[in-house]
Amino acid sequence: RKDLTCGKYKKKEKIKKEEREFLKPNKEGKTIHDRPEEIKTREEIGHWEMDLVEGLKGQKEPYLLVLSERKTRKEIIELLPNKTAKSVSKALDRIEKEIGVVKFRETFKTITTDNGAEFRNWKSIEQSYTGSKKARTSQYFADAYSSWQRGTNENINKMIRRFLPKGTSFKGLKQEDVK
């Protein structure tokens, strides 16, 4: 009977197969050490860092996808319904449709991310929604637990936290609010 249980056991939520694949360690994709040296100097525009900012922890909450340009510190923030690789690639597809395929390739030459499950599907991040064989960008993975390798992005995330502190729900936010 339900009233006789001690209440300390909760049923774990099942992880879908396609999401489980991205929980495995990243053995594919390019690391930050494969990135061209000129990206480190910040002399050229078009090299971005990408991360997710979460709202209420443990809730089915929207997330903020934050893209930060390394030289100009320009930022693009997209509201995502969840923390999946599919929603990240859909957000990049939306941006690509908005600015055009050629402009996207010029604007987003490289994107550096952490090793989160949401960025593991590097093929969908690099590949255009048009199905073109030419990659729309190149993705590089930072080393695990090395947030300083994406310092621009981490600083912008800190600024976002001034307005949306940890523990704040993003449920009431709209895309227009975050732009």
Language model region names:
Residues R1-T41:
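Basic, flexible linker segments flanking DNA-binding modules
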Residues K30-H33, E44, W48, L52-V53, ...:
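Long, charged, low-complexity intrinsically disordered regions
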Residues K40, V53-E54, Q59-I76, L80:
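Short conserved beta-strand segments at catalytic cores or DNA/RNA-binding microdomains
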Residues R42-G46, G167-T168:
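Glycine-centered loop/turn motifs
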Residues D51, L67, R73, L92, ...:
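Mobile genetic element proteins and their domesticated derivatives, centered on retroelements
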Residues L56, K60, I77-V102:
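Active-site beta-loop-alpha junctions of metal-dependent nucleic acid enzymes
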Residues T113-N115, R120-K123, S138-L164, K171-K179:
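RNase H-like two-metal-ion nuclease catalytic core shared by retroviral integrases
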Residues I125-A135:
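Short, surface-exposed basic-aromatic patches at helix termini and helix-loop junctions that form
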